[in-house]
Amino acid sequence: MSKRGADHQLTKDQDDSDDDRHGPVEVPKEASADVMATRKIAKPKSRKRPTSGVSSPGIFANLAAKPVSLPASTTQFTFGKPAVTANNDSDIHLKKRGLNKSFIDAVIKSVDNNPFGNLSPLFDEYRQHFSSIEKKPAEEQPTSNAVVSEVNPQQQKSQDSSSFVTEKPASSEKEDKEKPLVPPGAPRFGFSAPALGSSFQFNSSAFTPKGSFGEKSATEAEAKEKETSSNQTATGTAATTTNQFSFNTAANPFAFAKKENEESKPLTPVFSFSTTMASADASKETKQTHETKDSKSEESKPSNNEKSENAVEPAKGNTMSFSWTPDKPIKFDTPEKKFTFTNPLSSKKLPASSDVKPPSAAAVGFSFGTTTNPFSFAAPKSSFPTSSTPASVGAEKSEETSNGNKSEQEEKENGNDETRSNDSLVSGKGKGEENEDSVFETRAKIYRFDATSKSYSDIGIGPLKINVDRDTGSARILARVEGSGKLLLNVRLCQDFEYSLAGKKDVKVPAASTDGKSIEMYLIRVKEPSTAEKLLAELNEKKVSKSEN
């Protein structure tokens, strides 16, 4: 689109010369009819498709307006077997093969869905189809086994090209009613499941029991005689029968019946799912006689060489029999238990010994023949001396909070424990103690004063001794870790140092440091206040005796 051109040059002196307000105004004029005819008026594009040509029908063609009909077609849709068969025998064999394959598939599918279902409807339907195939039709008409729908050219014009619904002529209505879509002789390969109402329905004879587990009725004997007679007649006429898949005749290739040399033995169908009970109360009788039958299972079962009158023997080659008889019920024996997982403590009790005493209810940990508690802070009484005893950290607190007899008993036990724990350490002397005598022994807890935190820190607990040298008479305090014998405290007594009580059970002991440049303060805590007083007296006495010597 080009810009409108100017009539003259625009300058600063003539800037208002193009203003339309000062000049004449052009009035629009209406165009004439000739001018309008020459002009082309643009119209918006239409979404409708042009009707020219034939368009392919869509899936919703029936809902829309009917388009132009296609030319008449003479196509025929034939459903069924062809009108003329080249070889009738080959067609029959193909039908039989297809029927057998469909039957096997139907049986497998039914067993997968319900292993305990009734397959008799499938067998009946199979026999019906097989017999219909065997019967040769009298005359085969070209259109007897086919359903032909011809397209009428006149009717095609009024119908949609994509519609599959064809109107039937008025003249053929009667013929359609008379003629079935599928002739009765044609095979049908559909194995539909039976209705729910008749799935597990038994005949009236099935609900009227014919025998019990322990007795044999007369009706059962008659039924067996009929079966034997029918089987004997079936073996004689096996060559003339045409049924190839029966369960009652011995000449069928798929029959599971007895052999010819065993005609005297009564035969029963292999796949027999019906029960032969004597009365409705047979279930009660089975519960009463179940225990006696289990104990006499060997007597009730007939052997291979013996023939029992009451027992019904299956075929010789039969290994999968689902039927049962009153004298030979189905029984699942429980396997013999080879491995028994039992608690040995529940079966055999350990012999009680006078030396071994059971642990008390308050015992904690592992106890092997003793009543000691290795994880308690206050060790109990024991008659056996040991080299190490558990730590009694909370012994002081438990003593103060105990009542009456309990506190006295703990004092006796702690006293015995203290004597027992110090026996081995006091009697055995360590390195450097060969020429020394121990004048005082006790069990104590050692603390050291920390200058940074300005408090006493625990360094260990163990036996404490005051040893005096035999030659020089000098005394020292020696303490080791309980159990391991690690050295905790080894200080010489000095006359210039002052030893005093810091509490009822605590004794303050100053000592020179290892480098000799400073003084370290130790705190010895014992169990009894009297022990603390004795310790303080020994310290003051031995430091004086050292200076006098």
UniProtKB/Swiss-Prot annotation:
Ranges of biased composition (kind: Basic residues): 40-50
Biased composition (Polar residues): 141-165
Modified residues (Phosphoserine): 17, 347
Every RanBD1 domain range: 416-549
Residue spans of biased composition, Basic and acidic residues class: 1-32, 170-180, 217-228, 282-310, 328-339, 407-421
Alphabetical list of SMART domains matching this protein: RanBD
Function recorded in the entry: Functions as a component of the nuclear pore complex (NPC). NPC components, collectively referred to as nucleoporins (NUPs), can play the role of both NPC structural components and of docking or interaction partners for transiently associated nuclear transport factors. Active directional transport is assured by both, a Phe-Gly (FG) repeat affinity gradient for these transport factors across the NPC and a transport cofactor concentration gradient across the nuclear envelope. May play a role in mitotic spindle formation and/or function.
Protein name: Nucleoporin nup61
Organism: Schizosaccharomyces pombe (strain 972 / ATCC 24843)
